[in-house]
């Protein structure tokens, strides 16, 4: 899995630093970003899927969504568009440079993110997430 891949890549980098042989470092760094982001995004996704979760946001998050997207419906429509366009993930992130929330479609775990952004919500739209229950109807999964 992603955790084992991340740990293995980190071990390779540590060994390379110790030996001074960096021939496999580029591949290991790629494995750090791929496996690290895969692990972090799946962790966030499962935290978001809490059985007691769901419904519309409240409090500070709702206030910020309304400020940055105009309304909850505006955010939701844009998030669903990101999920429909993405090959892998749709993310709601906080962009500290622009100081606002953004919806981001991401095709691979480590591509498409804004540097320095903090993911708040993740929707896994890889086929393994929905195909068993929804078949090719990804839109139905997104709507659920």
Swiss-Prot record:
Disulfide bonds: none annotated. Binds 1 Mn(2+) ion per subunit. Its EC number is 1.15.1.1. It is an enzyme of class 1 (oxidoreductase). SUPFAM superfamilies: Fe,Mn superoxide dismutase (SOD), C-terminal domain, Fe,Mn superoxide dismutase (SOD), N-terminal domain. Keywords: Manganese, Metal-binding, Oxidoreductase. Residues 1-22 are annotated as: Disordered. It catalyses: 2 superoxide + 2 H(+) = H2O2 + O2. Mn(2+) binds at residues 42, 124, 128. Gene3D superfamilies: Fe,Mn superoxide dismutase (SOD) domain, Iron/manganese superoxide dismutase, C-terminal domain. InterPro entries: Fe/Mn_Superoxide_Dismutase, Mn/Fe_SOD, Mn/Fe_SOD_BS, Mn/Fe_SOD_C, Mn/Fe_SOD_N, Mn/Fe_SOD_N_sf, SOD_C_sf. GO terms for molecular function: metal ion binding; superoxide dismutase activity. Its cofactor is Mn(2+). Belongs to the iron/manganese superoxide dismutase family. Destroys superoxide anion radicals which are normally produced within the cells and which are toxic to biological systems. This is Superoxide dismutase [Mn]. It comes from Haloarcula hispanica. The lineage of its organism: Archaea, Methanobacteriati, Methanobacteriota, Stenosarchaea group, Halobacteria.
